[in-house]
Amino acid sequence: MRYNQFSYIPTKPNEAFEELKGLGFPLNKKNSDKANLEAFLRHSFLNQTDTDYALSLLIVDAKTDALTFFKSNSDLTLENLQWIYLQLLGFIPFVDFKDPKAFLQDINFPVSYDNIFQSLHHLLACRGKSGNTLIDQLVADGLLHADNHYHFFNGKSLATFNTNQLIREVVYVETSLDTMSSGEHDLVKVNIIRPTTEHTIPTMMTASPYHQGINDPAADQKTYQMEGALAVKQPKHIQVDTKPFKEEVKHPSKLPISPATESFTHIDSYSLNDYFLSRGFANIYVSGVGTAGSTGFMTSGDYQQIQSFKAVIDWLNGKVTAFTSHKRDKQVKANWSNGLVATTGKSYLGTMSTGLATTGVEGLKVIIAEAAISTWYDYYRENGLVCSPGGYPGEDLDVLTELTYSRNLLAGDYIKNNDCYQALLNEQSKAIDRQSGDYNQYWHDRNYLTHVNNVKSRVVYTHGLQDWNVKPRHVYKVFNALPQTIKKHLFLHQGQHVYMHNWQSIDFRESMNALLSQELLGIDNHFQLEEVIWQDNTTEQTWQVLDAFGGNHQEQIGLGDSKKLIDNHYDKEAFDTYCKDFNVFKNDLFKGNNKTNQITINLPLKKNYLLNGQCKLHLRVKTSDKKAILSAQILDYGPKKRFKDTPTIKFLNSLDNGKNFAREALRELPFTKDHYRVISKGVLNLQNRTDLLTIEAIEPEQWFDIEFSLQPSIYQLSKGDNLRIILYTTDFEHTIRDNASYSITVDLSQSYLTIPTNQGN
């Protein structure tokens, strides 16, 4: 374990003393540090009346137990504090450490010892070996009662809301939409979980089209074959129009007011929401139009879908109506809500957070968007090509519609509405235009970057630099496009398409607690969070602060002095093998074992680089045909320790999200010996070589120059590292698999790579 603490708010000695006293610790400024430490320890043994025995189980040095020490006349030393602090945080002497000073240095322990009250205060805010902060562990053990009132420590809400007395209710929010032309406004089902309290409370909202169920068989049947011919396109310039965001003005309902009349027993919850539920935040889960319990069509990513989620935030602020049922005869008021909302969730869920933020909806104070899509074209297409998300060849937006249109999972709904649904789905399948792979109005209507200037909320993004599902370009684009007037924060980790709130190496939960206590509960805690926090790829459990995602300097590296050719065609056996399992293709590609058609360029580095942003390949090429795919990957190649991309369990169910509530595993990315690491990659239709909206003809055997931007990353490279560039045609994981007989020739003497860095790195 190594500490990377971003959540602690520096506290003055007097303030620390008052907070400790407020928690019930019997401290006294007139007493010695030793006496105050003993009082602190005895009060911490919440489940034991025999505190002498509890003290006797702690040690203050390699030979003395704490009970003996406190009965003696020995002075309290720094070494004594170090032994005790480590034990309070769950580290075991003679197992985890023998020399506390050296161990504390190794784990980057953030606590100082100048003032006993400041020191104990900071200690309480530190995470233990199990992942829980000491204060959270003590509250769970009974330091404070679950009295359904707010209690704070170091600017963060504590788990004092009773999760055994939760209210679970369902309402149906009326939208301004009619996505299936039914003649009625679409209703959206909302599942609410909230503590029983007299306070008006903020809301953690997860907008998840998956939460009411998914239709795997329909999606599987809809999934496309990737084998086919790459189209030769007519040269043209694509025209699109940005439509202003607008919706029908709603007026207050005059219907009778009623409490919610529908409840539920269970819903798959997001554990970060659970953490905040026990701290006085309501949790709501909304699947939006076209899902089970709601009405309407699954419009998949456009602003109609976004509006269906926006209506829920408007209801929390008293602006639209929610009904007790589909009868629409009684309304429910959100009189428990303070109107302030934070959205949460990963992937599609985080994507809806971005879309909501771009509406500028009142009441949305914070989005916590993890691995979020910023433009749907970049999810299912790339540079004029159909480009499946990593791991899902053949998926497209209409396949996702089939997966998430969960109304068809309800038989009565199916027989009434499936014909209309199928007609709308067919229209969607035509609009996505798999034949050309080009940008068009349909994709433009699902590009949230067009409305990013409307964002008013505070923004928190997390993204994996090894996420080839929702690729890093999504967060790179949106984060750098956000208005300068808002506060924005970005956590970039070395994992794939995963959550990071339950990792051992970073206090993400506690940082979000400080931020949401500030923004949604109005606590003036002076919390400041850095703009870009990046997981260092060279060292285990180490996070660094950067000024920006994207460097201000470009380093140029030549690619060689020869001309090399890439064949596209494979023999039938090899082609069928790679089509059957794209992982076989990737393995052969990265090994460079002459089984795949590729150009491999090894670039031994002559100095250190902190790669920060989008690498670009500047290539002089010619092709033998009027169509061609060019794919590229950049690898850090050669044996050394690197991160795996999927976190593994450190301790099972050790993370407590309240008082023994919704426990989950503590995880971390393994750091092990490996042969290579993908830094970046990309694919390009050479007919779209200038920009996304311009289609140009290819003249066979005629040289032309291209600039090819790859996926952005932040990656520390060292002098002597081998940077491997692989150039090839068909990517069997992502692109159309056209086995046509064409080739691409690259003039390496006229080609180079640019690496984005910060000046001086």
UniProtKB/Swiss-Prot annotation:
The keyword Lipid metabolism does not apply. Its EC number is 3.4.14.11. The keyword Calcium does not apply. The active site is at S347 (charge relay system), D467 (charge relay system), H497 (charge relay system). GO terms for cellular component: cytoplasm. GO terms for biological process: proteolysis. It is found in: Cytoplasm. Its main location: cytoplasm. GO terms for molecular function: aminopeptidase activity; dipeptidyl-peptidase activity; serine-type peptidase activity. Keywords: Aminopeptidase, Cytoplasm, Hydrolase, Protease, Serine protease. Transmembrane segments: none annotated. It catalyses: Hydrolyzes Xaa-Pro-|- bonds to release unblocked, N-terminal dipeptides from substrates including Ala-Pro-|-p-nitroanilide and (sequentially) Tyr-Pro-|-Phe-Pro-|-Gly-Pro-|-Ile. It holds the Pfam family Peptidase_S15. It is an enzyme of class 3 (hydrolase). Homodimer. Removes N-terminal dipeptides sequentially from polypeptides having unsubstituted N-termini provided that the penultimate residue is proline. Belongs to the peptidase S15 family. This is Xaa-Pro dipeptidyl-peptidase.
